[in-house]
Amino acid sequence: DEEKLKKIGETGVSAMICDSTNIFNAGRAGSESDVRDSLLQIMELKTKRILVTSFASNVARMESIFYCAKKTGRSISLVGRSMHRIFKAAKKCGYLKGLIEPLDPREAKRIAKNKILYLATGSQGEPMGAMNRIVSGSHPEVFLEEGDCVIFSSKIIPGNEKKLYNLQNQIVRNNIEIISEENAFVHVSGHPNRDDLKDMYKWV
């Protein structure tokens, strides 16, 4: 929100704590709206269950998934404690307005497979993440079947490769489709690149 940041700058700022994760990446980060459009195009072609896994802390991505669920006529269900926690916190802070209400997973499992979309934690293959439990068949409410689609709307954090590839191998063995940033445009970083940071410092 360029105008809002400029107004903050006009009031006078003594110090600012800023995200510098992608400071060494030249140029600008990709647009979340472009990812949203790409995800929608992908989901419109799917006829069975869709499960998207992403970082729970990426509220913009969460909003994009809710948007896609509504546009494709699907109900949405959140899976994983941190996903529920971030959703509630974001709503409390005034974000995620005008979205469809998520279903409890116990309700969601009764929905026709072409009418449900899950948003789950565990995109890095974490042993206790929701994705691992779903894929291993140990989740009490959520399951996947042959022909369903899993979208990894995230990047691999260095060091997590083995865990994640083991998880994805298990998904493939179950004849479930995998879509990730390796074969489709389903993720942009939530961290600003160098030129984005220059703009923000200039505005503030």
Region roles according to the model:
Residues 1-110, 129-139, 162-164:
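His/Asp/Glu-rich metal-coordinating catalytic cores
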Residues 67, 71, 90-204:
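C-terminal regulatory/interaction regions
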